[in-house]
């Protein structure tokens, strides 16, 4: 009974936190006078990846950076396969070419680079530093571009939020999302354990979704409120943060031993999911892509559990 209450509490907390966090993103874009997608790709993406960053850093300091690697790469599959797949079921997403520029193609290149580093069965500190350096260069590039594109403030539905209120809403909203993720993982794990479900299954299926709950709520609410560019930017930015910063930090603290078969599967699924996200010339990502993404995610989970 307690576990069910935890899950219900997680749902309520996630809804409230997600609404506050989305308003904070829109408020930040308004006050900084930059496009919403830039704020989503940077601030929102980094904030929603906080659970993965915390977990991977703690694991690396404990001498188990493989946990951080699995969480980061697995979360990337969850982000696109599960989360955007669900978002597309609500309807097609209209994007622009600007939404799929350098950030998207870098997100495609990162899994290939990670695979090359992993071929010898480990990601060495030097290779992790390379990933982290690429992340910092990309971040500087995005910030520089944002400063160049600053213009007059435009009403984007953020209301009359002051910068201070936007910041407070962002902190409270993100805190609620992270807490909701922890409640969800705790409740679901308790139920699964009571039913005799294997611990690995719990980790692969439930914990991955729990740590990605901030992205899930942000993207779904962005869709419902008509801010699709926020959802797209958050997921692409989160994938870059996971693949470059989190793996880079974990590997810099401690070299990562790589189970090549599992990592190859995860990287391949993440890459295929990104390719399915690429829109046509009209910029439209059609609804049936969502079905394909969900099938891909389900296949990834099933194969992972059987391996």
What are the language-model segments listed below?
Residues 1-307:
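Hydrophobic alpha-helical segments, chiefly the membrane-spanning helices
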